[in-house]
Regions:
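Long, contiguous internal "core" modules enriched in hydrophobic/ aromatic residues
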Residues: 2-317
Length: 317
């Protein structure tokens, strides 16, 4: 273990450092302006594909011919990809929330979220550092509802309920669940005690319940990546979705077992599949193909997990 003692550099010094390492910068002032808006550290993730490698180690020096425009354009591509993905997730989130509320309220009543008996019992899990924590979806969603009830900036429909009713204490599910985060939606589906409850929600999206819950977990993970403006395009996904072997009702990829589910391509296929249900006229795939075409000279689809013949898949036609 060493001691970190690198001093902060001015934008001019940062540009000169990159030039000294072999990066071609045709317009230094433009590069400085980019660094002042984006930061060296954030952009460094987009420099890695252009760095030299020796014995499996990424070096400081750039591959000859690498330019500032390549780095910056890769950053821009990733930003546009995140926006495209986030837009699709937003549409899915609304539909998933709607189905959870609809299916469970018709089965268990308007306040099903207040019935702990429909959820699995609390679980104790051990973290990497050895600490033990209790995971209880019922307690967590009740805590969130109470926070909303006590928030003077809560949605108007929550405030209206509090002004007009004193029983039940919590608003009905179509209000309470409307203000929950995607993480809550994912956990609600996963922790429903009866498999039939999960099945009724998942069937709307043409998925088996175990696949649906797994995909929700991954969608929540990628949603957070997008929300925090983190690198997405060639990231290895830490939360890997389960494989959907085939679908009788929707167009799906022909050989799902051969696709790397830890890469973004499989996730993009997931989004496209789900969008077939909630928005059959979605232009998601057209916009994705246009984005990849525009940046084809700098983006490695291999690094994203795309098969070489992906454009021939029916799901992308």
């Amino acid at each position: 273990m060493g001691v970190y003692n690198k001093p902060p550099l001015t934008y001019t010094e940062q540009v000169e450092l990159l030039i000294s390492r072999g990066l071609l910068v045709s317009d230094k002032k433009r590069a400085e302006r980019h660094l002042s808006n984006i930061s060296y550290y954030r952009l460094s993730a987009y420099m890695r594909p252009y760095k030299q490698i020796a014995n499996g180690v990424i070096l400081d020096d750039f591959i000859p011919g690498s330019t500032w425009d390549m780095v910056y354009n890769l950053y821009v591509f990733d930003r546009k990809l995140r926006l495209l993905v986030f837009d699709a997730i937003e549409r899915l989130e609304v539909a998933i929330r709607t189905q959870i509320i609809y299916q469970l309220s018709h089965k268990y009543g308007s306040h099903w979220q207040d019935d702990k008996n429909i959820f699995n019992s609390p679980k104790t899990i051990t973290l990497r550092d050895g600490r033990k924590v209790v995971k209880d979806v019922y307690v967590d969603i009740q805590r969130h509802i109470k926070e909303q009830l006590n928030n003077n900036k809560a949605e108007e429909f929550i405030q209206h309920y509090c002004r007009k009713y004193d029983s039940p204490e919590n608003p009905p599910s179509w209000m309470s669940v409307e203000v929950m985060y995607f993480n809550h939606l994912s956990r609600i589906c996963t922790e429903l005690k009866n498999r039939s409850d999960k099945t009724e929600i998942a069937e709307y999206f043409s998925l088996p319940p175990d696949i649906f819950c797994s995909w929700l977990h991954t969608i929540n993970y990628v949603r957070n990546i997008c929300a925090h403006h983190a690198r997405l395009w060639n990231r290895g996904l830490d939360i890997t979705p389960k494989v959907l072997k085939f679908s009788r009702v929707r167009v799906w990829i022909s050989k799902p077992d051969t696709v790397k589910r830890s890469r973004i391509y499989y996730f993009l296929c997931m989004l496209n599949y789900l969008l077939q249900t909630i928005n059959p006229t979605s232009t998601f795939k057209q916009r994705l193909k246009a984005l990849l075409e525009k940046y084809s000279e700098i983006v490695s689809t291999d690094a994203m997990g795309f098969p070489h013949d992906w454009v021939n898949e029916k799901i992308w036609e």
